[in-house]
């Protein structure tokens, strides 16, 4: 799922570091954050509900929060979401109850995070999943049977050089996710067909992002209606 964590964002929190200075200035105006929330939320199911619905790939974007003294890491999409720790524990609870299920967690955007923040996040991942974490290896050698035999259930993709320091972090290049960046369904389908046919035959997984992306004029036209009412087909 896309922006998998964004079923809840906190409109009372500061605007996230993933936003431009212009958006941050606008957010000081009353009601602007309520409008932002309509465009930040891309899911209406919790992690648990998404898992129960069959989702096994999660697109995750994370950030530190200004003024947060304990170095907690939060999910982010314009506005701050829940703590990463809480989301990971919710996922682990499902996996413990379903020992043959395997999931992909794709940490692909990091904001306002220094080395200490990354270490904190990686520690949270270890604490949540422990021996369920599958070490990085050849994609071709990985089968469900192998995962079941070794009781591995979680593949973590980490789009940051810190992956090199931990055997259970897979490099981001192992799961490319080409992005169409369009509001046109026709262009999106053509893009998906093209990138699928051009994907690497070996050595990596592949994500087909079947999503429409609003442009500035899209948001301006559907400002009050929000993302779901404007782009969901």
Q: Model segments located where?
A:
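Long, acidic (Asp/Glu-rich), low-complexity accessory segments flanking structured domains
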Residues: 1-53, 66-98, 102, 162-172, ...
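Short amphipathic alpha-helical segments and helix-helix/interface helices
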Residues: 47-48, 91-92, 122, 126, ...
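Short aromatic/hydrophobic-glycine micro-motifs
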Residues: 55-56, 131
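Structural recognition of the beta-strand scaffold that forms the well-ordered cores
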Residues: 56-60, 103-107, 154-158, 206-208
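An acidic- and aromatic-residue-enriched active-site/binding cleft used to recognize and process polar
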Residues: 62-65, 107-110, 161
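Intrinsically disordered, low-complexity acidic segments that are enriched in bulky aromatics
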Residues: 76-133, 152-154
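Surface-exposed substrate-engagement region within the catalytic domains
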Residues: 136-233
């Amino acid at each position: 799922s896309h922006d998998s964590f964004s079923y809840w964002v906190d409109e009372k929190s500061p605007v996230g570091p993933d936003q431009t200075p212009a958006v941050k200035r606008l957010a000081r105006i009353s009601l602007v954050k309520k409008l932002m929330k309509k465009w930040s939320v891309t899911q209406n199911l919790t992690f648990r509900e998404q898992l129960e619905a069959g989702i096994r790939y999660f697109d995750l974007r994370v950030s530190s929060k200004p003024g947060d003294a304990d170095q907690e890491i939060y999910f982010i999409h314009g506005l701050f979401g829940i703590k990463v720790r809480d989301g990971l524990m919710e996922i682990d609870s499902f996996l413990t109850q379903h020992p043959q299920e395997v999931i992909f967690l794709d940490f692909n955007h990091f904001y306002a995070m220094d080395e200490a923040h990354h270490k904190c996040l990686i520690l949270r991942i270890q604490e949540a999943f422990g021996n369920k974490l599958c070490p990085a290896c050849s994609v071709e050698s990985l089968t469900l049977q192998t995962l079941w035999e070794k009781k591995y259930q979680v593949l973590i993709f980490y789009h940051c050089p810190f992956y090199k320091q931990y055997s259970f972090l897979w490099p981001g290049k192992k799961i490319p996710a080409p992005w169409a960046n369009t509001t046109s369904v026709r262009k999106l389908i053509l893009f998906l067909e093209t990138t699928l046919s051009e994907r690497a035959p070996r050595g990596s997984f592949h994500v087909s992002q079947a999503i429409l992306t609003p442009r500035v004029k899209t948001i301006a036209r559907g400002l009050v209606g929000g993302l779901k009412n404007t782009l969901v087909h």
